[in-house]
Curated annotation (Swiss-Prot):
Species for this entry: Arabidopsis thaliana
Biological classification of the source: Eukaryota, Viridiplantae, Streptophyta, Embryophyta, Tracheophyta
Pfam families: CP12
InterPro entries: CP12-like, CP12_dom
Any one GO molecular function term: enzyme binding
Keywords: Calvin cycle, Chloroplast, Copper, Disulfide bond, Nickel, Plastid, Transit peptide
PTMs per UniProt: Contains two disulfide bonds; only the oxidized protein, with two disulfide bonds, is active in complex formation. The C-terminal disulfide is involved in the interaction with GAPDH and the N-terminal disulfide mediates the binding of PRK with this binary complex.
Record GO cellular component, one term: chloroplast
Keyword tRNA processing belongs to the record: no
Name used for this protein in its record: Calvin cycle protein CP12-2, chloroplastic
Cystine connections: 75-84, 117-126
Length: 131
């Protein structure tokens, strides 16, 4: 499991196979930087997750907030479980969908002249000429 984000580490296995095909145990426990478990401790340098506030109509931000709460509840007991990883993957996908929806909304209505010309194609400002 590898994640590219600020504050996350790559998880490694505690046992690996050498060229002699016998397992070798790593010394000591593997500690992960659990940045998703922010509610149980104070953080000075870690990024905190905030719900998305500015989202288009359709309730995407509500779904993202709900999935963040569910992911936090899922990860409360075992933050390195597969269920926890899947819950945060869902949050990431929903956040990306909300971001794409906001970008699309900005692109659709970004030019006021185009909106004006859709309503008034006969005006001088909106005429197009072919040579």
């Amino acid at each position: 499991m590898a994640t590219i984000a600020t504050g996350l580490n790559i998880a490694t296995q505690r046992v690996f196979v050498t060229s002699e095909n016998r397992p070798v145990c790593l010394a000591g426990p593997v500690h992960l930087n659990n940045s998703w478990n922010l509610g149980s401790r104070t953080t000075n340098r870690m990024m905190k997750l905030q719900p998305i506030k500015a989202a288009p109509e359709g309730g995407i931000s509500d779904v993202v907030e709900k999935s963040i709460k569910e992911a936090q509840e899922t990860c409360a007991g075992d933050p390195v479980s597969g269920e926890c990883v899947a819950a945060w993957d869902e949050v990431e996908e929903l956040s990306a969908a909300a971001s794409h929806a906001r970008d699309k909304k900005k692109a659709d209505g970004s030019d006021p002249l185009e909106e004006y010309c859709k309503d008034n194609p006969e005006t001088n400002e909106c005429r197009t000429y072919d040579n």
